[in-house]
Amino acid sequence: MIYFCTADLRRGYSLLQRGHRLEKRLITNLGGISFLDCVEECLRTTRCLSVNYFQPAHFCEVNYKKKESLPDLYFVNSGWYYSERDDWDKAIAGPCSNPNCKENEKCVPKAFGNIKCEISDCGIPTNEGISFENVQDGDAIGINRKMHITCLDGYERQGSEVFICQPNGVWKADLICKKTNLST
């Protein structure tokens, strides 16, 4: 189905940050799509706050954080573009411009202007004592993705440091971080 789009793109393009990338806070990534398709994916994904786009390879990264909250992970990076969700007209998302999807869902357009909310991610792990220090470039919280998570200093690790996001939106993980008892 073809939709007539009346979205204003000027503001979004004027605020685009060329040569920058926010690292290690991905929901998912997609290859072979245009920059505007990348922005639309963000607008349809409830948890998305920003995107990175690598122009030479038409590669999109959908982020769950903004640069303001993680300045240490925001880098100058040639070929990349960084943009925030709030900079874009929601009308780009067509029938998904005002969905009522849950935080870990994304809006998927269907025939005749209908929409469907589908699970997009497992959320940000909140287990006691965990650290995102070992998250690797390419790790993500999206469905069928994995993250490398370890324990904070002062905690003992039991189990694997690899969390896998299952299709039902629940992490598969056996990492337990137990507070160590240090005698002084």
Q: Each predicted region: which residue ranges?
A:
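Short, charged/polar, Gly/Pro-enriched secondary-structure boundary elements
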Residues: 67-73, 182-184
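A sequence-level detector of short, solvent-exposed, charge-rich linear segments
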Residues: 57, 61, 70, 79-81, ...
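Conserved N-terminal submotifs of small, disulfide-stabilized extracellular modules
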Residues: 8-36, 77-184
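N-terminal "mature ectodomain cap" immediately after the signal peptide
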Residues: 14-66
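Cleavable N-terminal signal peptides of Sec/SRP-targeted secreted and luminal proteins
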Residues: 1-7
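Short linear functional motifs in flexible/disordered or boundary regions
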Residues: 50, 54, 60, 72-74, ...
